[in-house]
């Protein structure tokens, strides 16, 4: 069942067909939740956390990927040069994510050749996980439209840097007060 609250539209290129992504919940033919639907499982866990402890999860994901098809300069890892090589691509990713309501914060080079990371603002509950999926699909779409290929595959070679995802979580109560903050 499509969830219109988990939708994103990419309409950045006027001469190309827009990309409209809507995440969905898996259901059985009778309409009951499918037992292996990850969104339903997460929703149930978040509901239990809220009901039992009055807590909600705020999450953000740092997602690393390799951009195949981009000119690379060996040894430019984490550098301004690596950033400049992907400046147009990075600007497009940020613009498209912003237009799609994903609240991007950073696009930056990582440790591997032609490896980059994209980060968005934290989101509450299921929206945080949905955002992680939507961001990946938008990055892939922007890469494809630029004649490149973005891969989030963890290990793409026997040696070198792998892609990772850093998940930042915090808990807050129903009043929005942080519960994991320790001054």
Spans of features found by a protein language model:
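Glycine-rich, acidic/polar active-site loops that bind/position phosphate-bearing ligands
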Residues: 1-183
């Amino acid at each position: 069942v499509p969830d219109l609250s988990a939708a994103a539209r990419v309409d950045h290129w006027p001469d190309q067909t827009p990309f409209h992504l809507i995440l969905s919940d898996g259901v059985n033919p009778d309409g009951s939740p499918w037992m292996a639907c990850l969104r339903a499982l997460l929703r149930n866990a978040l509901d239990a956390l809220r009901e039992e402890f009055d807590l909600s999860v705020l999450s953000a994901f740092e997602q690393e990927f390799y951009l195949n098809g981009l000119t690379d300069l060996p040894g430019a890892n984490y550098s301004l040069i690596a950033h400049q090589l992907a400046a147009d691509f990075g600007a497009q990713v940020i613009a498209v994510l912003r237009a799609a309501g994903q609240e991007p914060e950073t696009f930056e080079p990582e440790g591997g050749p032609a490896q980059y990371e994209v980060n968005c603002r934290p989101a509450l509950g299921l929206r945080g996980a949905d955002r992680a999926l939507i961001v990946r699909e938008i990055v892939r779409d922007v890469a494809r439209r630029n004649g490149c290929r973005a891969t989030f595959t963890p290990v793409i070679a026997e040696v070198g840097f792998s892609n990772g995802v850093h998940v930042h979580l915090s808990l807050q109560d129903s009043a929005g007060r942080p519960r994991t903050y320790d001054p």
